[in-house]
């Protein structure tokens, strides 16, 4: 017979049979080798065909293994020949193919030829229940009246089961999530499916709004018989385009597979509805030089009504791919899927609640569901409901489950800190200097304290974990172990029996005892001990997830934070001196926003700081960032003098399409996208081009800005501070006059520089006073304190006398330049001499660096600490 007339699958089976014979040192390939190869290939379909013919396939494999062991072996024989018995079976296979009119010989005909085989392979199949007539009927059913006319004829058989997923079957098994709401969209989809022509709906909507869920909802309705008569009993099949493309190495393979799918769909008389998720991927899929893509192959079937199809894609991709192909677009009817509102999202989450509770093994409360919908809508602006709300519920549930299964976060942090200190201890032990010895003592003390704390937590955690897991699961486990012990005893496997009897069983019984006592004590509240494990997902857990994802402090304010906000002025005054009015206005704005009273559609606060140079405008902004985020890193500083030209506006929001740098994004918009909760400092704002203020209008009013790529950036969680020197000459000339009078004069000058619509959108215009002599001394203390902190890192202490402090303040005071000359005075009169003395070795570790003013000069006299 001609081996080139075998189908690809059959050729592969013969090659595998040859390898099997060679591995086992068999000199000849026998029918049993080929049978083993066919059953060993999951893609061959031989096992499913035999099962359909009533063969007990699970009995076949052990019998084949036994038959292979009984075959003669020849050591060192490399040339494996086709055995006489196999030749005889192949001849019968060839005759059967000719009788059926097949151009190529398929592997199922080999199985049919084995039905009459007198050898091992035939005997094994007959003993497993093979009957020739049943196998012939199964082959006819699989072929569907088609002949094998190509080498891939076998591969493309049952294409629907290979390349699609049956959603109606999954719905029947209860594997699909319940679909809540979306009745209008499902009804419109059903309406389009019932049309005579162009009965192909395409669901178009933003990512995450529930397009796929609508199709799953349709599948569930079909299963529940909640659809019109024309749709009853139909199947919804999800097309797996990746499976169609995977492994299509040669030209025409992909087209052949898709053609096989379309052919099967054409034969089913419209009983199958194909769902193509990400419909735009069909345009261009499988396209090679001069070949057709999947989109073009679908058009005729769609036009004739042979293919009942539902597509789903996003708005952008529909416009980019489908709309460009007018012939494809006209064959689909659009169903726009909008983003559900917060109320609808809450209803959807309530429907999914039970599924997520089962998956995570925790309880999800109703306040958590409401919080997930509201907080995701408010704070996660770059994604869509209900997807982003479901994500919050899912992640909060996963977090609680993880705490139950593994160490609680507080213990994990302690554990890592203990390891870190142990590593440091080993490194410091090798050093012999005094500083290392002192550090070693500190490490030992801290390690002992942390270890005690960890042990206390571990004791609480173990008790709580035992209570949470409950007794039922442990009882079931004990029951299972005892059943396993009885089985092992019957088999005489006493080593494994001993492991269970003296190892696992006592451990489980101890756990059961602990769980029982923990459950009894669960009702008794122990206020002295912190609770480590949570079993409920509440609103606070959702807020924690949002806070971690966005960096925005959404979580309920703890008492410590409330006190901190109430004393905000004291914190800011530690760094900003002499600007009481400015500090009060800024503090009030932050308190309003954190108390939830500020307008949610605008930034937390927008301020215009006015005043002479060096009075603390930028320093107050830095102090504000430090107060809100415990770090000045969260301050986005933009020097507006860099935006003096008209075209420089594009640098803020990103270049428009077609310009160089389009993909890079804007300087301001990208910074806020990465840190949505931050203080934005627009320094020297009056130096910017007037067009820059047009961009800022929508930021100040609506709290959002559209960048060069059309993405909306959320500024609602930012504090915007603009600084300017405008009116500084009036502020200095009117020193000592009431604040309101100075502000009125400065306001008149502002009107000449900035447009009314810009000024009208700013929350507060804050006028900074010029600094006076008494303020400079307080600022000098702050500057010297920072110098002292730098010296402390070198184990030295700075001690400045009152006389020296007064002299520094006097020499550093300049009413025109504010506090900046003071910084230079500290640098020149203190830092420079001290730096020289340290380098000369006069001052070293554990020394006090005294600074005094004597006889018209600064004096530094060394004393031991």
From Swiss-Prot:
Spell out the residue ranges making up region: C-terminal. 771-865
Q: Which UniProt keywords apply?
A: ATP-binding, Chaperone, Coiled coil, Cytoplasm, Nucleotide-binding, Repeat, Stress response
Which SMART domains did the record assign? AAA, ClpB_D2-small
Q: Which Gene3D superfamilies match?
A: 1.10.8.60, Clp, N-terminal domain, P-loop containing nucleotide triphosphate hydrolases
Q: Tell me which residues bind ATP 1.
A: 205-212
Q: Where is this region: Linker?
A: 340-551
**Record region (Repeat 2):** 82-145
Identify the InterPro entries for this entry.
AAA+_ATPase (IPR003593), ATPase_AAA_core (IPR003959), Chaperonin_ClpB (IPR017730), Clp_ATPase_C (IPR019489), Clp_N_dom_sf (IPR036628), Clp_R_dom (IPR004176), ClpA/B (IPR001270), ClpA/B_CS1 (IPR018368)
Function text: Part of a stress-induced multi-chaperone system, it is involved in the recovery of the cell from heat-induced damage, in cooperation with DnaK, DnaJ and GrpE. Acts before DnaK, in the processing of protein aggregates. Protein binding stimulates the ATPase activity; ATP hydrolysis unfolds the denatured protein aggregates, which probably helps expose new hydrophobic binding sites on the surface of ClpB-bound aggregates, contributing to the solubilization and refolding of denatured protein aggregates by DnaK.
Note the subunit structure. Answer: Homohexamer. The oligomerization is ATP-dependent.
Report the sequence similarity comment from the record.
Belongs to the ClpA/ClpB family.
Annotated domain remarks: The Clp repeat (R) domain probably functions as a substrate-discriminating domain, recruiting aggregated proteins to the ClpB hexamer and/or stabilizing bound proteins. The NBD2 domain is responsible for oligomerization, whereas the NBD1 domain stabilizes the hexamer probably in an ATP-dependent manner. The movement of the coiled-coil domain is essential for ClpB ability to rescue proteins from an aggregated state, probably by pulling apart large aggregated proteins, which are bound between the coiled-coils motifs of adjacent ClpB subunits in the functional hexamer.
Q: What is this protein called?
A: Chaperone protein ClpB
């Amino acid at each position: 017979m001609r081996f080139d007339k075998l189908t690809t699958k059959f050729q592969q089976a013969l090659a595998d049979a040859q390898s099997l014979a060679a591995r086992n040192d068999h000199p000849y390939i026998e029918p049993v080798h080929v049978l083993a190869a066919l059953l060993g290939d999951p893609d061959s379909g031989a096992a499913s065909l035999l099962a359909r013919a009533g063969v007990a396939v699970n009995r076949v494999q052990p019998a084949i293994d036994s038959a292979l062991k009984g075959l003669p072996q020849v050591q060192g024989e490399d040339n494996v020949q086709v055995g006489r018995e196999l030749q005889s079976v192949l001849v019968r296979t060839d005759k059967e193919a000719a009788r059926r009119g097949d151009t190529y010989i398929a592997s199922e005909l080999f199985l049919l030829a084995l039905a009459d085989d007198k050898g091992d392979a035939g005997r094994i199949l007959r003993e497993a229940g093979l009957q020739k007539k049943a196998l012939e009927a199964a082959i006819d059913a699989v072929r569907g009246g088609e002949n094998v006319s190509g080498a891939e004829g076998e591969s493309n058989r049952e294409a629907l089961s290979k390349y699609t997923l049956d959603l109606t079957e999954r719905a029947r098994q209860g594997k699909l999530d319940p679909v809540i709401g979306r009745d209008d969209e499902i009804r419109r989809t059903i309406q389009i499916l019932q049309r005579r022509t162009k009965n192909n709906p395409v669901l178009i909507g933003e990512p995450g709004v529930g397009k796929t869920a609508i199709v799953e909802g349709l599948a569930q309705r079909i299963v529940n018989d909640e659809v019109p008569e024309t749709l009853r009993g139909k199947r919804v099949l999800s097309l797996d385009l990746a499976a169609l493309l995977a492994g299509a190495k040669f030209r025409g393979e992909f087209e052949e597979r898709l053609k096989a799918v379309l052919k099967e769909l054409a034969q089913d008389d419209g009983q199958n509805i194909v769902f193509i998720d990400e419909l735009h991927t069909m345009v261009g899929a499988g396209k090679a030089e001069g070949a057709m893509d999947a989109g073009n192959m679908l058009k005729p079937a769609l036009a004739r009504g042979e293919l009942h199809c539902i597509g789903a894609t996003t708005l952008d991709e529909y416009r980019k791919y489908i709309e460009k192909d007018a012939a494809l677009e006209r064959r689909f009817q659009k169903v726009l899927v909008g983003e559900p509102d917060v109320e609808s999202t809450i209803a959807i989450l309530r429907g999914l609640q039970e599924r997520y509770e089962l998956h995570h093994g925790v309880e999800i409360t109703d306040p958590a569901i409401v919080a997930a919908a509201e907080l995701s809508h408010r704070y996660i602006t770059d994604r869509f409901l209900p997807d982003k709300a479901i994500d919050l519920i899912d992640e909060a549930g996963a977090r609680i489950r993880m705490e139950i299964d593994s160490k609680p976060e507080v213990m994990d942090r302690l554990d890592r800190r203990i390891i870190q200190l142990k590593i440091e201890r080993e490194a410091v032990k090798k050093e012999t200097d005094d500083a290392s010895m002192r550090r070693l003592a500190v490490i030992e003390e801290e390690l002992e304290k942390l270890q005690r704390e960890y042990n206390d937590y571990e004791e609480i955690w173990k008790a709580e974990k035992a209570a949470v897991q409950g007794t039922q699961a442990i009882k079931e486990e004990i029951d299972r172990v005892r059943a396993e012990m009885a089985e092992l005893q019957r088999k005489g496997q006493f080593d494994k029996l001993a492991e269970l009897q003296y190892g696992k069983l006592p451990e489980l019984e101890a756990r059961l005892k602990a769980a029982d006592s923990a459950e009894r004590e669960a009702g008794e509240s122990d206020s002295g001990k912190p609770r480590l494990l949570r079993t409920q997902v509440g609103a606070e857990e959702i807020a924690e997830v949002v806070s971690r994802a966005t960096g925005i402090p959404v979580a309920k304010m703890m008492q410590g934070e409330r006190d901190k906000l109430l004393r905000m002025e004291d914190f800011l005054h530690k760094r900003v001196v002499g600007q009481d009015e400015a500090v009060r206005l800024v503090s009030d704005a932050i308190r309003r926003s954190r108390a939830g009273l500020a307008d949610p559609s605008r930034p937390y606060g927008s301020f215009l700081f006015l005043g002479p140079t060096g009075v603390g405008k930028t320093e107050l902004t830095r102090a504000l960032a430090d107060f809100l985020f415990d770090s000045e890193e969260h301050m986005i500083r933009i020097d507006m003098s860099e935006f003096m030209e008209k075209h420089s506006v594009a640098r803020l929001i990103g270049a428009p399409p077609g310009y160089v740098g389009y993909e890079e994004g804007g300087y301001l918009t990208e910074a806020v996208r990465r840190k949505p909760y931050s203080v934005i400092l627009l320094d020297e704002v009056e130096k910017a081009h007037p067009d820059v203020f047009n961009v800022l209008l929508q930021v100040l009013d609506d709290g959002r800005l559209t960048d060069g790529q059309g993405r909306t950036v959320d500024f609602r969680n930012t504090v915007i501070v603009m600084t300017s020197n405008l009116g500084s000459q009036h502020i200095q000339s009117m020193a000592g006059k009431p604040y309101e009078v100075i502000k009125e004069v400065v306001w008149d000058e502002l009107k000449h520089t900035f447009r009314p619509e810009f000024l009208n959108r700013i929350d507060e215009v804050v006028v900074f006073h010029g600094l006076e002599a008494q303020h400079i001394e307080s600022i000098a203390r702050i500057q010297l304190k920072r110098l002292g902190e730098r010296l402390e890192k070198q184990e030295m202490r700075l001690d400045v006398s009152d006389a020296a402090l007064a002299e520094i303040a006097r020499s550093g005071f300049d009413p025109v330049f504010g506090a900046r000359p003071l910084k230079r005075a500290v640098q020149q009169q203190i830092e420079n001499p001290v730096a020289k003395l340290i380098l000369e070795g006069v001052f070293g570790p554990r020394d006090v660096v005294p600074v005094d003013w004597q006889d018209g000069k600064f004096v530094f006299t060394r004393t031991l600490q």
